[in-house]
Amino acid sequence: MSITSLIGEVNHLDEYSGFLQNLYLSGGKRIAIVLAIRPGVSGWMRRTLHQLVYCTVGPVPLDSLICQFGPGECSKSSGTSLPCGFRTSPAGDSGGKIA
């Protein structure tokens, strides 16, 4: 499962899931996602969608990167727990998981 798919499952909002998928599929080597959240979205969800940043660096798959809070911070370390509750697996494994 990709991180993009994981986000779709977590937020249960098709418009955001689709938006993330489209950005990932059409994006270049570096993708930063900042969503304008409508009123009514929970504080946790608002912070998560605003602050999660996805980066792809060269041929490295998106789901092999640790995507952290902050401006474009990415690490190739795998299995690290993130503040938002996400954890990724190394490329070739089953992809993103809920920590």
Curated annotation (Swiss-Prot):
It comes from the Bacteria. This is Uncharacterized protein YcjE. It comes from Salmonella typhimurium (strain LT2 / SGSC1412 / ATCC 700720). The gene is ycjE.
